[in-house]
């Protein structure tokens, strides 16, 4: 959750952060992973970022290193004792983590200044970053207002569920958004995310009109995705929709078992041949550039 700290600065619940990444947008980027997500994707590869800790304490007894304790009704994590065995993540009934922490806008700016000479920009991801929208807006605004940081691009990695009012708050300080589309037909999208597709499609069109759709990401799940028709060509409805976006980079992601739980462990992993077919179908219709993952 996003809160105001006692100095009036925005804070957010953060799962973790990376000082350098070359896979979360162009260039070398600092990545902030915010906790909490409003989708329930069976194939999520970071399921421990979905929920928020309610301090039930279920994770405490199973910690082999004694890094967790229930003190005054709150779970406390001692990083110096933690071996990162992740048993606490498996024990959590809320798909949360006891290892999250609060970070303020000011603290993120300190990190950006520390690593700034080596950075192209910052990407805020999740979970779902827009569930903590006030923090993201405040952070990006602070970066744009700081002369020594203004050269850094501010990108968002999102599921596209934010409504138009929220996007209008964010657009003035946003350089671009990378949006996931995990299914085309309503029924398929719902089965893969737990939510409908309407807001995602609206977000894609809004960002495209604003010139801030940095990347469209399509997830290919064998036997479940519906981007291709029965003949192996691009679905006609998807073709019509993509034409409304104009030129946009497309990244294909193939489903993998890494990190997933439950029923999705029984799903087939995507082979490169399947991604090649989708890539070729997109290119035949003139969409792209299309990039493939290093499976």
Locate each region found by the language model.
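Auxiliary Fe-S-binding modules of radical SAM enzymes
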Residues: 2-26, 220-295
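Iron-sulfur cluster-binding cysteine motifs and their immediate structural context
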Residues: 42-52, 58-76, 87-102
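Class I S-adenosyl-L-methionine
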Residues: 64, 93, 113, 205, ...
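Short Fe-S-cluster ligation motifs
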Residues: 66-72, 81-92, 110-128
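Conserved AdoMet/S-adenosylmethionine-binding subsite of the radical SAM
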Residues: 106-266
